[in-house]
Amino acid sequence: MSYRMFDYLVPNVNFFGPNAISVVGERCQLQGGKKALLVTDKGLRAIKDGAVDKTLHYLREAGIEVAIFDGVEPNPKDTNVRDGLAVFRREQCDIIITVGGGSPHDCGKGIGIAATHEGDLYQYAGIETLTNPLPPIVAVNTTAGTASEVTRHCVLTNTETKVKFVIVSWRNLPSVSINDPLLMIGKPAALTAATGMDALTHAVEAYISKDANPVTDAAAMQAIRLIARNLRQAVALGSNLQARENMAYASLLAGMAFNNANLGYVHAMAHQLGGLYDMPHGVANAVLLPHVARYNLIANPEKFADIAELMGENITGLSTLDAAEKAIAAITRLSMDIGIPQHLRDLGVKEADFPYMAEMALKDGNAFSNPRKGNEQEIAAIFRQAF
């Protein structure tokens, strides 16, 4: 096999496993932090002895002063970043600690960008548009899904246009990521299901991406295998530590894969559902994934056949196309087994919005690495199939 040149980005330091949270204080010290802005949401902050309380304990034990911003919303908004930036500046913070899933991590990255770059955040949408270093970011992760703790992506919603935009830059990479599966124990089944399908979407889209390489393929394949074997158990019994740990590892691998291979039409389309309808990102991905997979199947049937086998399907004796079809069946069955809604019509989506969402999806940065190039009519048709 002939390899083209490729690069591979990951955060500087990653800690994984039970009680990994215990390193957060010392790691902030090593980053030179004196006063941290802890970015989270009100729900996480309210949990007694939860991830926020544990993070605060270890930060204070290390002598790090802390200011808290808990105004992060799902599908974080540019207004959340503005409010968090005000706290960052008022409290004269020099390091950002994000605690939660993708929303706090992306909001924290946005605060870092706004603190070091002039003008509206939207003007930095795109790839490698940032010119200045951000404050150090230490990302404490509590969900197995978005993997924002290990990626260069910052996804925010423009509240005026209701469009999600993505700022992709190596400068967004957290200096430290912490994945402690003990912080994921007891998360609600619906959240576990949605974030788990987000992780699966990351792995599948990275694997079939035009920008995939041998290293991203290896990470994506193992992520798909782990998710197929553990997501049902994590949803059924939230206290199953082995399933939680395997899902956390799968999410980490999927994040490292798409951080380098990029994504595709599932995410480009899901961002429109999140922007217009504030739909949970994992749910949007889960509903769209089988339909986009069917559209992409002819672009790389061999890899879809691999996905089928990784998900436990018996493809012995089948043609490549028949084996590839089994991947779509396996994805759909997993989604149904864990209680994900199967149709956009059940989630309040309006058919009249499909042409606009299709137009905007093709402008989304994730669209450019999709293995099959589509047009607005084809993307609108995929929305209708998912409806």
Segment roles from a protein language model:
Residues 1-95, 344:
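ATP/NTP phosphate-donor binding region
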Residues 79-182:
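Glycine/threonine-rich beta-strand-loop-alpha-helix active-site module
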Residues 145, 252-285, 364-368:
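Glycine-rich phosphate/pyrophosphate-binding beta-alpha loops
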Residues 153-261:
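Carboxylate- and glycine-rich phosphate/diphosphate-binding segment that chelates Mg2+/Mn2+
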Residues 210-219, 234-246, 261-266, 318-324, ...:
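Flexible, glycine/charged-enriched surface loops at secondary-structure junctions
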Residues 276-353:
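Gly/Pro-rich interdomain helix-loop hinge
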Residues 350-387:
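Short, amphipathic C-terminal "tail helix"
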